[in-house]
Amino acid sequence: MSKEKFARTKPHCNVGTIGHVDHGKTSLTAAITKVLAEAGGATFQAYDQIDKAPEERARGITISTAHVEYETEARHYAHVDCPGHADYVKNMITGAAQMDGAILVVSAADGPMPQTREHILLARQVGVPALVVFLNKCDMVDDEELLELVELEVRELLTSYDFPGDDIPIVKGSALAALEDSDPKLGHDAILELMKAVDDYIPQPERPKDKPFLMPIEDVFSISGRGTVVTGRVERGIVKVGEEIEIIGIRDTQKTTCTGVEMFRKLLDQGEAGDNIGALLRGTKRDDVERGQVLAKPGSITPHTKFKCEAYILTKEEGGRHTPFFSNYRPQFYFRTTDVTGTIELPEGTEMVMPGDNIGMTVQLIAPIAMDEGLRFAIREGGRTVGAGVVASIVQ
């Protein structure tokens, strides 16, 4: 009998596996689908099905990502797994595959390695809200004390990057044992324990519709006798006719009232996350608004010109720069719908940035942009993308 499609009645959550190369991220992904398939919550996907991940493009960057889906009693999950380290870096920075939480895979035989650190740092910088740890390959370690040492080391590492290292669930097991049905305790049972930890510890993300209203302005029209209409896709929240909203970014913040919402030439009483709408603004002149500003719920987001970010710089092969850049490099930063020029300040001790690097840096824009932590952007030179970034913290 063929399985029916997943019912979308359960709350949905996006997760992904992160960690050092060869610590078992893809094997774990396969093992989760295998164990959950027994309960009817997934379709088993073997290692090689997941490993040959298709390429996709996000913000002008090609990334290989494998997507699998499965469900537990509690939730429906979309799970991303990347074949190579560079794909992880690109994925996390561009937000191509949103992660509401991540499963950090650490080999018990090796302990934390350089990419373990780097992925934890990236998770912190791009705002992954919660991590759960799977200590893999425990069947290769006979010494209980060694396992405890590795666990301690992982907890200390997490704490050093501002994650709650003492509280994060760490599940010991073996993805291979689950795939080969060799040791039920380290295999099957450990996977179920891990999924229970993911269910309980990774918070349910707030739906875009429940967040405060925000719409990036794409176009501005003036309609005789009616006033000024701005169009765009509502990014989050709901706007109701008659509500006061703010126009933020590029210029001084203005207050206005939304006197009409139009979609597909029909008048509506509200627009919500995902809708492409035209919003009629009371008393706003055509020249008072421009592409690149946002409409937002008053007080929910503020304009800023200086921020710290994490960025990935494209290689020459990816269509990026052929040469490194230095402090005071001035490209354009493309936020939502517009480019703003900004100056880059590299961290102390970093002389230059090579194509293919990922780097934390500070940016000073020439005009303010409505931003909060986690906002994604592209770095461009004369219209071509040379990098991608995410706001890690706001300076001013």
Curated annotation (Swiss-Prot):
Region feature (G2): 60-64
Predominant subcellular localization, coarse grouping: cytoplasm
Location(s) in or outside the cell: Cytoplasm
Source domain of life: Bacteria
Span list, region G5: 174-176
Catalytic activity: GTP + H2O = GDP + phosphate + H(+)
Residues binding GTP: 19-26, 81-85, 136-139
Binding site for Mg(2+): T26
GO CC list: cytosol
Positions of the tr-type G domain: 10-206
InterPro entries: EF-Tu_GTP-bd, EF-Tu_GTPase, EFTu-like_2, EFTU_2, G_TR_CS, P-loop_NTPase, Small_GTP-bd, T_Tr_GTP-bd_dom
Region (G3): 81-84
Region listing for G4, in residue ranges: 136-139
E.C. numbers: 3.6.5.3
Keyword Nucleotide-binding: yes
Class of enzymatic activity (EC top level): hydrolase
GO molecular function per UniProt: GTP binding; GTPase activity; guanosine tetraphosphate binding; translation elongation factor activity
G1 as annotated region, ranges: 19-26
Assembly behavior: Monomer.
PANTHER family linked to this entry: ELONGATION FACTOR TU, MITOCHONDRIAL, ELONGATION FACTOR TU-RELATED
Family classification: Belongs to the TRAFAC class translation factor GTPase superfamily. Classic translation factor GTPase family. EF-Tu/EF-1A subfamily.
Protein name, per record: Elongation factor Tu 1
Gene: tuf1
